[in-house]
């Protein structure tokens, strides 16, 4: 295992209490481990396209260089006296932009939160870049020479004790792996897979600290704990990877049972483009007659355990997944329907995101990448009616090549209980965590939404995609939408405000983030801004009723799909652990790359309305700026 992110839908709902979800959140993790005190501080810098064009005009290019070589030259010229390595996850996106990622090193040891990302345009020149490289004093001696640091077993004990992890390390032995100073622990219990440790530096408070990065997957938390290499009961920082045929289902666009009835859908992969060449029930080598295929394995998990391979799945040799549901049934009575619905929703979203550029090279979730690059063997494991929790959901995102894992829970806030698998917005929100964690910082690095503001945007992206997809043809910019209202049985939903373009209905601006210490609240602000972006683009370009977008010159022709595409492309451009301002600039730059900036003013109108105006400069305090660019 290597770095991963666990993201959940909401703060925990007290059992039996219907009125206290995310609207009354503290910093406490819904899974019981409060990582907020351990989050990395924000250090990323981002050079947007206009500034980059002015900055690198004198940069030496060679026509013989490929995009990786050009990116490498930029890093070397920017930090000529620093050492770094190229991360093996570079690719060219569907918008023609090449993405290359670098990790800073010291004495051959990774500085785990020191990253440099370079985006190369179609013309072979640097388009944008971002970095969080450490620029302070480097250690004078190589720590591997004296090895005056604790062994990894002590670091494992320290992480378990300090964070109160449910792992028993009494017989732990550190077994060396192929990668230098990397160990797997045998003889432990309580984790879903063997814990691991790797010796890395981190930058904190202006200094480098040598740490053991201890990785523990305990189900609802998949943690990277940075344990001091000498004082092993000191945990400096923590990253959590987890941040929620014929089918009779609620069709795509119906958010929950209040919006329509289940209908019969035949061979939906025929309408969702090239994302599933083996259909949804094959992976190029095996054909399945259950809810499993190249993209998704969907099953129940009533025990809440880590085993999934042999769990129950609906089976039909005729691939006819037709089951009954009505609102008077208990979730257990309609588990076949729920698993089928989960399988349908996640596969459809997979195929939609594929059309936008979340492909094999970009780190998507597939068993067989069909020779198209990236790391395979990492389809998403999707558990319906997971017994490890209630009133929530989560998604664990390890780096490319390791399975994503979704856990969908039942909600006890209504009688009978409700199944989150039937609320598409919750499923889409969770899968979107996999999207953002694979794209931000590159598919090999799942640590790039670990800081508070960046983690908040991870939550906001989930709500944005969930809301954009549920829009109806007769909606207008005056239409408001909530999040989680049906599953939680809570009028107004589980966010502080509904998503609305009306400042009286939802008054959030960027300045409101200043007083927030919890990712879901921050995420609501970000999704609120993106909801304005969405409607500005729909007003300009209309809204298609089709599941899949129509592309003209590489860009979706309608506003809804264009918004979703630009937000996705923006993720690929921004630096590791971005802030709102850098994410805004990345979306503007994504439009520059895709449409030559045709939508700049529509985008900036939305950003400036919510306090991210053109003259905003990120500082210690978040103060609104409502300025528009002079050319708008």
Swiss-Prot record:
Pro-piece positions: 20-244
Example of a GO biological process term: proteolysis
Cofactor: Zn(2+)
Pfam family for this entry, one: Peptidase_M36
Enzyme kind, highest EC tier: hydrolase
GO annotations of cellular component type: extracellular region
Keywords: Glycoprotein, Hydrolase, Metal-binding, Metalloprotease, Protease, Secreted, Signal, Virulence, Zinc, Zymogen
Cofactor remark: Binds 1 zinc ion per subunit.
Compartment annotation: Secreted
InterPro entries: FTP_domain (IPR011096), Fungal_virulence_M36 (IPR050371), Peptidase_M36 (IPR001842), Peptidase_M4/M1_CTD_sf (IPR027268)
Matches recorded under SUPFAM superfamilies: Metalloproteases ('zincins'), catalytic domain
Signal peptide start-end: 1-19
Task performed by this protein: Secreted metalloproteinase probably acting as a virulence factor.
Descriptive protein name: Extracellular metalloproteinase 2
Organism taxonomic ancestry: Eukaryota, Fungi, Dikarya, Ascomycota, Pezizomycotina
